[in-house]
Amino acid sequence: MPIRLSKEKINDLLQRSQGDLTSSQDEIVHYTDVFIAGSGPIACTYARHIIDNTSTTKVYMAEIGSQDNPVIGAHHRNSIKFQKDTDKFVNIINGALQPISISPSDTYQPTLAVAAWAPPIDPAEGQLVIMGHNPNQEAGLNLPGSAVTRTVGGMATHWTCACPTPHDEERVNNPVDKQEFDALLERAKTLLNVHSDQYDDSIRQIVVKETLQQTLDASRGVTTLPLGVERRTDNPIYVTWTGADTVLGDVPKSPRFVLVTETRVTKFIVSETNPTQVVAALLRNLNTSNDELVVAQSFVIACGAVCTPQILWNSNIRPHALGRYLSEQSMTFCQIVLKRSIVDSIATDPRFAAKVEAHKKKHPDDVLPIPFHEPEPQVMIPYTSDFPWHVQVHRYAFGDVGPKADPRVVVDLRFFGKSDIVEENRVTFGPNPKLRDWEAGVTDTYGMPQPTFHVKRTNADGDRDQRMMNDMTNVANILGGYLPGSYPQFMAPGLAQHITGTTRIGTDDQTSVADPTSKVHNFDNLWVGGNGCIPDATACNPTRTSVAYALKGAEAVVSYLGVS
């Protein structure tokens, strides 16, 4: 059962935390039933389930970033300007992604004027310290593409919304009963508003999917990519992409729900008399630099696969598996221009006659038979045992088409490969900082312990990656020719933003951080959420899987509180 703190205990708690609380300010104490760190789709899954399934339970949610949309947690791509010009959305994504660990770089510039200041060439004379860089990060072990999005809604403000069902080989370590987890995945599908039919009427969708279905073996299972998206009924040219707001529903209207922004969750405070209980969360208001305390009965951390273990580490909650068993997907990418034969077939296909005729009537000089507002393709080639990678054939923000190619005939190919699970693949954190400011190798720019990656791909990973690249070039050649400047390439490690395993769930407290309900081992009232909870190597997008785990975790929170 949850413990309840008296005023005397609260005062004692404040006094014991005095070393962390801002001494020159009056401490602020907030009281709630459930405290949630983070505001992405996983945090919102917890909030939604708890509010919907209780009558009096209060939820207090803290987000380190700001609210950048008038709608709490909305997907930025719902903006008309980005639906009209997808390629411009890349600037939003790049602006939202903050690198996690930047390894030192060679600062020698041979063409710099001698009169200009430059750091010493001899390291013995001192080294340049660049704010935000991590001197402890070995470049060869880094995930340089890995980043954090600090905003209300998290990465769901700019994600692709792909929500495939994981293959059985992507859930071999799942401690949840298969039948139960299948049901959780279906519930996650509903919560994320996943559809597989919103692009069925698109000319490009039809011709790309049919070309692949007719050319590849049927065992590849070419199909429509399941997406968290719904076409608008008032104007079908546009769609509504799923964001954290979709998951949250009407929760923001509830007087039992509080969201604070630009507030860092510094650490959790464990009871001195009962080490299985967290009694409070220490927060830092980043606008005022004042510290605050949230006293609750249950606590949930859902701040991403790196920031969640970061907070646990800073709280001196350090299970052996914390940050270990890190798995990240490899990624290959290219863009193609559709074959002339595919494009020419559109003009003569009776299924498209009405659309083509209307387009030609309106734009008689256009040599392409594809209407300007025709939706992009959204095709998936799912993971199979023979081809253990996940494939998306579509058009998204990354990849600059440029002025010489019409985006209507450009298609992106993204292949995602899994990695072997290795305990030594991990993220570690700097020592507990005494000062809440940036310190090279000690803290990140938000004053939390600096993450450092130690990740290698195995030889087996390399073999799979090579096969995956070969498969991508084969698929590309089926569809068309490479767009100049966007040839087949491996993307920077970490760019997939699909890290798993850092707070993995399981039954053994030595090889996992939390139990099958995502409750941290040896704690009664502390839960974790997010892709880090996934104990498997995955190739498909992990969000739907993480939401499924979060639904089970939220049920456990409600059960723990003993409310209905």
UniProtKB/Swiss-Prot annotation:
Give the cofactor binding note. Binds 1 FAD covalently per subunit.
Please give the InterPro entries that the UniProt record associates with this protein. Answer: FAD/NAD-bd_sf, GMC_OxRdtase_N, GMC_OxRtase_C, P2OX, P2Ox-like
What does the record give as EC number? 1.1.3.10
Which terms in the Gene Ontology molecular function aspect does this entry carry?
flavin adenine dinucleotide binding; pyranose oxidase activity
Relay the pH-dependence remark from the record. Optimum pH is 7.5-8.0. Active from pH 6 to 10. Stable from pH 5 to 11.
The subunit field of the Swiss-Prot or TrEMBL record says: Homotetramer.
Q: List, alphabetically, the PANTHER family matched.
A: PYRANOSE 2-OXIDASE (PTHR42784:SF1)
Query: What name is this protein filed under?
Result: Pyranose 2-oxidase
Organism encoding this protein: Tricholoma matsutake (Matsutake mushroom)
Q: What is the lineage of its organism?
A: Eukaryota, Fungi, Dikarya, Basidiomycota, Agaricomycotina
Gene that produces this protein = p2ox
